[in-house]
């Protein structure tokens, strides 16, 4: 509609309409951004296209009814730079999302795209590139937080005629859409980073494992790979060197366990997605038995900019042990739902109340779940906790891939733990008994408690079984699956007691614990 309106006013020779990736501010989408003046129009409908073109482009006047309104001051904010949601962020992995047409390689190149690859191939040795990544302090953004440069170094040191580089784009956490947004908004950054990884590790083949439910991300990735080949940035003798590298796409069926690297590799090989015992690690023996380096989308998105700006610049951002930024999918009972990127060390309070705009409808903050089904629920006492890998683990949660769900006073924490166990039981690969059977028993106990049939003894059994699963499950997904139960028991034990002792649910979410009475004064029918 915007293009049609531009053509109706005969402005097509001087005005471009560019479809970009996600701006991140999902609460206010769809969004139209006018450049160069950065006017930011929110919640735009197709019927608004004519007004935008006629008023803004022809008459030079802003369409005031479409401008963002600061809820605190009730004032219009025309420039996105002055909107709290954006001005408190630092975008590195998301640097190009919303700024370029992801289907146009020239726009990526105009923002220093493929410069890092060229520099690596023509000015640096594989060892010096790996050292730069190690010195930057970049850690895996998929949840484990393993040092990225060290993983590359391990893969490089293994002698083998064939090696592989894998991009894990299997994003299975409920409410998480970080990797999808990067692939939809900046696919060339992933192509470039994978080629750099291939150069460093000695791999000539790259594989992107992506769930088939991401059709737009898949389509834009295909376009990026094709364009890179046409420009000689993938294929034989890249940048006139003896380095050759190519990328293929592998599709996942949406199994949560396939986010675990060994299960992912099994799936790519056409086998059932099941985790395997480590060692051997994929870096030593992975896809088709060959050394395989696996990183996730967000990890790769940081690589080109580290080589461009230097390890010292990147390591100056964040905390002592967690460098750089982290992308989060901020969701739940918060005013500003969306995709955000903040420096490591930013507090939960700054994210939820500064960027997120606080709790919806003036309700009271109750908890925030970080790390998805593998994470934990943190309370008001954790709001000033600086976000990094170690702090979240110490608090009983984890970074995970970046899901962050905010809850208010109307949420039941016992029901929330049961919700995540629902997911875990459904998604278990079934290979090991602690996860296959143990989580089912956990879920049954939670079902018993929320149905009003729980006992005090059930609470002790619940905690004991959760601890056994955590200690004995085969893979990281199974080992972390009891976290929602353990963290809610640690932080909201009084709610568990109310469910089993008083048979009440303070949030009024557990229907079996609700009692309905008829008021005869009002029941006159």
Give residue spans per PLM region.
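Accessory "access/gating" subregions that flank catalytic or transport cores
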Residues: 118-159, 315-316, 321, 329, ...
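Conserved phosphate/anionic-ligand binding catalytic regions in large, soluble enzymes, centered on
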Residues: 133-155, 197, 254-266, 272, ...
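Short amphipathic, charge-patterned alpha-helical segments
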Residues: 5-9, 193-195, 345-362
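Hydrophobic alpha-helical positions that pack around
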Residues: 88-89, 218-344, 356
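Histidine-anchored nucleotide/phosphate-binding helix
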Residues: 186-200
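Gly-rich Lys/Arg/Thr-decorated short loops/hinges at beta-loop-alpha junctions or inter-strand turns
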Residues: 100-115, 165-179, 282-288, 329-334
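Flexible inter-domain linker/hinge segments
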Residues: 67-135, 288, 292-310
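Ferredoxin-type iron-sulfur electron-transfer modules in oxidoreductases and energy-metabolism complexes
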Residues: 1-19, 36-65, 116-133, 161-165, ...
């Amino acid at each position: 509609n915007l293009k049609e309106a531009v053509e109706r006013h005969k402005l097509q020779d001087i005005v471009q309409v560019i479809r970009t990736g996600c701006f991140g501010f999902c609460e206010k989408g769809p969004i139209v951004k006018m450049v160069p003046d950065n006017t930011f129009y929110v919640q735009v409908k197709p019927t608004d296209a004519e007004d935008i073109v006629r008023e803004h482009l022809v008459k030079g006047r802003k369409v005031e009814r479409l401008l963002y309104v600061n809820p605190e001051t009730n004032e219009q904010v025309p420039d996105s730079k002055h909107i709290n949601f954006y001005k408190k962020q630092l975008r590195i992995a998301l640097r190009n999302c919303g700024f370029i047409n992801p289907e146009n390689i020239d726009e990526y190149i105009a923002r220093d795209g493929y410069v890092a690859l060229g520099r690596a191939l023509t000015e640096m040795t594989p060892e010096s590139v790996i050292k730069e990544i190690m010195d930057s302090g970049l850690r895996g953004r998929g949840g484990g937080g393993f040092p990225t440069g060290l993983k590359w170094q391990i893969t490089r040191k293994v002698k083998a005629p064939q090696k592989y580089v894998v991009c894990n784009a299997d994003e299975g956490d409920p409410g998480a859409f970080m990797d999808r947004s990067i692939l939809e908004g900046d696919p060339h950054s992933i192509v470039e980073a994978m080629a750099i990884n291939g150069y460093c590790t000695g791999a000539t083949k790259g594989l992107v494992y992506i769930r088939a439910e991401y059709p737009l991300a898949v389509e834009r990735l295909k376009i990026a790979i094709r364009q890179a080949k046409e420009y000689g940035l993938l294929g034989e003798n890249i940048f006139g060197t003896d380095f050759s590298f190519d990328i293929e796409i592998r599709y996942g069926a949406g199994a949560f366990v396939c986010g675990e690297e060994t299960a992912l590799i099994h799936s790519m090989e056409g086998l059932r997605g099941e985790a395997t015992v480590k060692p051997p690690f994929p870096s030593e023996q992975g896809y088709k038995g060959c050394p395989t380096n696996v990183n996730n989308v967000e990890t790769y998105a940081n690589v080109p900019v580290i080589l461009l700006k230097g390890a010292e610049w990147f390591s100056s951002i964040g905390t002592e042990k967690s460098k750089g930024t982290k992308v989060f999918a901020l969701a739940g009972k918060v005013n500003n739902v969306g995709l955000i990127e903040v420096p490591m060390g930013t507090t939960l309070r700054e994210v939820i109340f500064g960027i997120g705009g606080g709790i919806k409808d003036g309700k009271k903050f109750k908890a925030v779940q970080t790390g998805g089904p593998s994470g934990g629920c943190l309370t008001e006492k954790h709001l000033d906790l600086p976000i990094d890998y170690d702090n979240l683990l110490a608090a009983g949660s984890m970074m995970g891939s970046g899901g962050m769900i905010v809850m208010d006073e109307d949420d039941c924490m016992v029901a929330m733990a049961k919700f995540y166990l629902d997911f875990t039981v459904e998604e278990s690969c079934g290979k090991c008994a602690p996860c296959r059977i143990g989580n089912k028993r956990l879920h049954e106990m939670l079902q018993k408690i929320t149905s009003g049939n729980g006992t005090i003894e059930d609470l002790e059994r619940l905690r004991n079984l959760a601890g056994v699963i955590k200690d004995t499950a085969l893979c990281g997904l199974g080992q972390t699956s009891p976290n929602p139960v353990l963290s809610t028991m640690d932080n909201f034990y009084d709610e568990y007691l109310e469910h089993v002792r008083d048979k009440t649910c303070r949030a009024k979410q557990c229907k079996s614990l609700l009692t309905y009475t008829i008021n005869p004064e009002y029941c006159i029918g």
